[in-house]
């Protein structure tokens, strides 16, 4: 083994061990002492400083700035991966507000085998739950394996997407190539860009060919099928990504701008049409009432979420600008270097795509239920990324071969530094220690729920799991028939979308005291307003769900530490007027 390889092993070993120690400090039991970002940055700064010194001492050829950037990216990537690990555990209870719902929705694809009845397919994120359903092929796998599978999906799909994108850049320097891969990984997670959405663009990243437009059209259609099954606002994204590659790689030449635009227009119209047809087809096939899919268009818009607020202290607009301005700076410098040597139609094409996705992302972020991060700006951030790296690495094809201007190297490095630091800080600010209840508490909680459910079901009473329905999915609560209606997350969607017919049926069943037992999160009848995170969501849920339920049902048992509340019908004299 040569000396340089020995050095590489020393550097690799140090970075791996030290970054794992850093992750363990923030995510382990002592992480509760370092919840504030400032303390996390101080700890990170200490590790990074030592690592840069070791890198310089071990490999003197490294200049300080590249060594600093590489070090930041390595720590960020390993920490981001480490944040997934506390979620891989065997606790039967939901780890986040929506996690248990996700496993229940995934089980819908195998509902006959699991519950003995067929239930409606998922309304929310069908493709995510389709991917999450794969482990259900093997019956009775423990929940920790299902959790491991989703972590694998996050890392595998994101990694494949990044690999295909970076491959298009033809970066010959191996170290630079891996550095870019690591940076794009951090960039994607600042949204985050969800893995099940990325699958729709993988065909375009893999096979876009400016010289084979028919093949590209087929790839756009394939991606659009998946996009149509995934989310309404991602229907045009495969076509828009192909159009972005087209504007970056294909000259206008002598064809004229009308003929030039015809190709991306065909892709766009065809892709959106296919995605829309698939979405309509799934709505009909899923078993859901068609009106349920309309809630995405009737939800209230909370424009204040675009500015700093209790739900998202940074505000969607400011955080999006923060995440995107470094790349805009790099793009502006590269365009200046080229003498803006791209036809105005190509400028407008990319600009209009970015503007449409930016405005669309802001509108979706303002919908009630959203606005707590910038994940709805994912498509905007994606196209911006592609544009930036194509220009920076010289993959964009200018319309003529004018000499390049002198680069603003120092200014470019400043923008690159911020492009690394901003997603790194957003990454380090995520992830907290996950302290699970003791095994005895978990067993007692399950025993309590089982006893109350058995008693309620003894006389053919219905047991409604508003929350924690995955306890039935994974057999933690046994011999209790599934009541498929009114799962909490779907119920919240109907509340936020003001689906009056759905909510009227729910209220009628509650008034009729149709359920012998309701298992829910602790219900509160207090309005909280916008001074608390997700205050608007709380208030509509209180008005449409909590108050009607508490009027006709009374809590009989609170299962603390999880938290879970068991409710039974009130006696006639106790029902509110």
Predicted regions mapped to residue ranges:
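Signature aromatic-anchored transmembrane alpha helix within multi-pass, membrane-resident enzymes
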Residues: 1, 7-8, 71-73, 265-269, ...
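Start-transfer (signal-anchor) and selected internal transmembrane alpha helices
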Residues: 1-83
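Transmembrane catalytic cores of multi-pass membrane glycosyltransferases
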Residues: 23, 79-134, 141-155, 185-196, ...
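Transmembrane alpha-helical segments
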Residues: 46-51, 157-165, 199-211, 222, ...
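Membrane-interface helix-boundary motifs at transmembrane edges
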Residues: 55-67, 166-175, 208-214, 250-260, ...
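Transmembrane-helix motifs of polytopic, lipid-linked glycan transferases
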Residues: 148-181
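Extracytoplasmic
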Residues: 281-287, 422-575
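Hydrophobic/aromatic-rich transmembrane helices and adjacent perimembrane loops
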Residues: 369-413
